[in-house]
Amino acid sequence: MAVYDTHCHLDIVASQGIPVDQSLQNAIEANLAGLVQISTDLRSASFNGSLKEKYSERLKMADAFSLRWTAGLHPEAANELESLNGIFDIVRKHRDEPEFLGIGETGLDYFHTTEFVKEQKESLNQHLKLARELDLPVVIHTRDTRQYEPGKTQSVTDTLQAVKEVGGIKGVLHCFTYSYEEAMPFVEMGWKVSFSGILTFKNSHTLHEAAVKLPLECLMVETDAPFLAPVPHRGKTNEPAYVIHTLEFLKKLRSEKLGEDPEKIQSQIERNIQEFLSFKG
C-alpha cells in the first residue's frame, strides 16, 4: 500500500492521549506509506520542524515510511497575524528540505464567527503570495456558516477569488465537505480534493455525490486527526492509521455507483497523492 494520511495534527492527537510515537507506530503497522503533519500556528510550525530529529529512532524502524510537514496559520487563529513573520521564517528556513512540503493550513472559516474575516483574508493572501514566490503547494481550509446551503458556500467562493487573484498556485482543498460544483473550479486549475472521515458518515449526501462525480484523478484521503474519526471509529480520537477506512469507503462508493474497479481506484488515489507531494517546485 502506498497510501498516505495527507492531513493530520500529531501534536493535537498527543494532547488527546495518543503519543506521537504511538501514532507513528500505528500508522506503520497499518501499512501506510507516510503522512503529512500540518501546522496551524507558530507553535505547531516549530514542532513540525523538529519531528524528524525527535522521532528518528521510531522512523528508522519503518521501511521507507515518509513524514512530510507544512507550516501555516489556521484561519481561526487569524487574530494572531503578528505571528506570520515567525511562521514564514520557518518556511524559508526549511523550504529546500525534502521533508518540508508546503504552506498551510490557511483559508477561510466562517463557522463560529465572522468577527475576523478581514484578518482571515489578509492571512490567506499572505500565505498565497508566499506559496507563489517559493513555488510551494498550499493546504486550504474552508468552512462556512451553520446555515450552509449546497452551492452557496461563501468561504469557498472567497477562497477561489483569492487564489485566482494571486495566480500560479497549486494545492489541496482539505477536508472537503461541499458540492461537486464548488470543487470543480479548483480541480480545473490542477488542484486536489481531499476527503476526511466525514465521507463515511451516513448523512453526508452532498459529499457522497461529489465523491462520485469528481474526476478520480483529483481525489485524495486524509484523517484531519484527531478530529472527525471515520466510521467505525466515529466519536473516538482520530489518528493517521484510520485513513484506511475513508479510503475503503471511497472505493466502495465509486465501485457501486460507477462500476469502477476498487484496485484501480486505490492505485489512482496513490498516484494522486504522489502528484500532490510533487507539487513543490
Language-model features: where?
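Mid-domain alpha/beta scaffold segments of enzyme catalytic cores
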Residues: M1-G281
